[in-house]
């Protein structure tokens, strides 16, 4: 919260009408917790993806300043952060660290939620403390965060040609990932990623189509455990 405190104090002295929005990761929202409690309060746990902001307890002076000068708090998910990292790279060929990209993630979210047009929005983009191994995680998560991919667990018959038949039921959609798990002589469990063309509305359409053709399937696109450990 030190950056938010310092920036908000400075900007409010220059132009008091500026709206200051603090951004936190949903997994380490210590300012939001302090705001709700009226004083700094320790979180039981924090996520480490955005490790630059993985703080359990907000400092008392930082809280005092942010509480006085910050107008609003927004939280962003890991998927939204990954989408922001991708956008920054696409536009500038610069790779921001997760904590540094949170402001861009929040701007994207704020514009969408409030249908913002013709306004000037600014974000503080800082930090390049990332590593090569993080990039694969970011690449996979941003597709889910931007709703360009859906992930399903599906039961299919354990027989020759069953996967081909399953693919034909997808209506020409591209399969981005496939993991197979033998279950029994009659049944197999598969974990499948499917590229989307129509965003969120397509999730329920795929589920409905597969269920209608006799497949038992579960949408895991928003399942954090699946995103972290099954892929």
Locate predicted features.
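A short, charged, Gly/Pro-tolerant segment at domain boundaries
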Residues: 101, 105, 123-129, 226-228
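Beta-strand->loop->alpha-helix junctions that form or flank phosphate-binding loops
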Residues: 23-26, 75-77, 96-97, 176-184, ...
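A conserved regulatory-domain signal marking ACT and ACT-like small-molecule sensing domains
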Residues: 132-231
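Glycine-rich phosphate/pyrophosphate-binding loop at beta-loop-alpha junctions
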Residues: 1-68, 109-156
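Active-site-adjacent helical/loop segments in soluble small-molecule enzymes
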Residues: 59-118
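Short, well-ordered alpha-helical microsegments
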Residues: 4-5, 103-104, 203
């Amino acid at each position: 919260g030190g950056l938010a405190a310092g920036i908000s104090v400075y900007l409010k002295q220059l132009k008091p009408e500026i709206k200051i929005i603090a951004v936190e990761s949903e997994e380490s929202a210590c300012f939001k917790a302090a705001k709700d409690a009226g004083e700094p309060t320790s979180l039981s746990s924090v996520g480490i993806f955005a490790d630059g902001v993985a703080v359990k307890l907000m400092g008392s002076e930082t809280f005092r300043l942010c509480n006085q000068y910050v107008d609003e708090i927004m939280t962003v998910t890991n998927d939204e952060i990954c989408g922001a990292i991708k956008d920054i790279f696409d536009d500038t060929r610069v790779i921001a660290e997760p904590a540094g990209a949170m402001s861009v993630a929040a701007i994207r979210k704020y514009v969408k939620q409030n249908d913002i047009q013709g306004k000037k929005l600014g974000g503080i983009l800082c930090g390049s403390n990332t590593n090569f191994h993080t990039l694969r995680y970011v690449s996979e998560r941003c597709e889910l965060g931007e709703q360009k991919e859906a992930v399903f667990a599906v039961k299919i018959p354990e027989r020759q040609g069953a996967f081909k038949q399953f693919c034909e039921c997808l209506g020409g959609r591209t399969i981005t990932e496939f993991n197979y798990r033998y279950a029994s002589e009659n049944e197999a469990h598969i974990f499948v990623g499917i590229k989307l063309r129509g965003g969120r509305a397509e999730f329920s359409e795929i589920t409905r189509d597969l269920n209608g053709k006799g497949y038992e399937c579960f949408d895991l696109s928003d399942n954090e455990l699946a995103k972290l450990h099954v892929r």
